[in-house]
Design a protein with these regions (language model features):
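Carbohydrate transferase catalytic cores enriched for Leloir-type hexosyltransferases
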Residues: 1-378
């Protein structure tokens, strides 16, 4: 059996989707042959896991396609890439290569790696599946093009993998996909990496990881943290990810949190250190498809506080402290105080639950269950 993976999911230098794909491919049973329709990529997971030999580094990028800078340079690049198929961007090169591979028919099953309709005119009667990672676009009503593509592909795919039961139920509810057409396969857990255990931050701190836009509910978390430190002023809030936006800076200043909130760009080893030494990890998001940072925190024995939304109870089980939070209303401050008064025994019991919950998540298991989906189709 030969499975063809197309290019889209491997395009970014680093992303959750590319990590998922590389993990399942590297753990795939030996009876599953595969090919990735990809010519150019600087994806770190592909390189670190040595999944493709001799892959080319992208030559034409938004920064260098012309040898000078000007306003809207990246937007012009995007327009050229979209409307001029011969423009030699990695996306155009990889798309054409994927189309050639799909037209050749030299595969038994296509595993489409995102949600884009480009391949439908070329696939003929060959079956395809794809993986649904979340339903953010539909639930928060943005990126209409992606919503449309997901709806079309959900009807035409022979089968769909959902990464959580919650995501499956959203897909069934929103697009009317039959239960039997969707298989839930959870992610595996992260590999524990070696790191210097010396503290990066000397104060006790609450750790926030990842993006902070809209549905991530970060603004409310700032307000909650502000309330908490009125009494417990020794704590900091450490945020990994991008620089604070103007709105975030304004709110941080308004809440007088400038000396209490720290933003950091971190490496994988630094992130492991931050998890390991954190007083707790907080995940206030209103919606996620899976929530991999939960398992990262579990891996480094960090107590976890979760918003009781979407897939979080499914993934974390009873190995977390749950709170209820949405814009302008939250009981997170009370839960932080509750954790503050935990005895050492209670913290150790919580961490033991985390360790046991983490055992459910294994990439070999994820790959095996994915291979079973492939086999059942063919």
């Amino acid at each position: 059996m030969k499975v063809l993976y197309d290019y889209i999911g491997f395009a970014p230098r680093i992303s959750g989707v590319s990590r998922y794909l590389c993990e399942i491919i590297s753990n795939m049973p030996k009876d599953i042959d595969y090919e990735i329709a990809l010519k150019q990529s600087d994806n770190l997971y592909l390189r670190n896991m040595k999944i493709i030999d001799n892959i080319e580094i992208p030559q034409v990028t938004p920064d260098n396609y012309v040898p000078f800078n000007f306003p809207l340079k990246k937007k012009v690049y995007g327009a050229l890439q979209r409307f001029l198929p011969t423009f030699p961007s990695p996306n155009n090169i990889n798309r054409q290569y994927s189309i050639e591979k799909i037209k050749s028919g030299d595969f038994d099953l296509l595993h489409h790696t995102r949600f884009n309709e480009y391949f439908l005119p070329y696939i003929g009667k060959k079956p395809f599946i794809f993986t649904i990672h979340d339903m953010n676009h539909e639930i928060f009503n943005y990126r209409k093009v992606d919503q449309h593509a997901k709806k079309v592909l959900s009807k035409k795919a022979i089968h769909i993998i959902a990464i959580s039961q919650n995501t499956k139920e959203d897909l069934m509810r929103i697009y009317g996909v039959p239960d039997k057409k969707i298989t839930v396969i959870h992610h595996g857990g992260p590999k524990k990496i070696d790191f210097n255990k010396e503290k990066i931050i000397n104060s006790p701190y609450l750790l926030y990881v990842g993006k902070r836009n809209g549905y991530k509910n970060f603004i409310q978390t700032l307000k909650d943290f502000s309330e908490f430190i009125r009494k417990y002023s020794q704590f900091k809030l450490v945020c990994t990810g991008g620089a604070f936006s103007k709105e975030e800076i304004q709110i941080i200043n308004k809440l007088k949190l400038k000396d209490y909130v720290i933003q950091m760009f971190v490496t994988e080893t630094q992130l492991a250190n931050l998890y390991h030494n954190a007083w707790a990890f907080v995940y206030p998001s209103l919606y996620e498809g899976f929530g991999l940072p939960i398992l990262e925190a579990y891996t480094y024995k960090c107590p976890v506080l979760l918003n009781k939304k979407s897939c979080f109870p499914e993934i974390a089980g009873d190995a977390a402290i749950y709170f209820d939070s949405q814009p302008n209303t939250s009981n997170l401050p009370q839960k932080l105080i509750e954790l503050y008064h935990y005895s050492e025994t209670q913290r150790l019991q919580l961490i033991e639950k985390e360790t046991n919950q983490l055992k459910q998540y294994n990439w070999k298991k994820t790959a095996q269950e994915t291979a079973n989906v492939y086999r059942n189709i063919l």
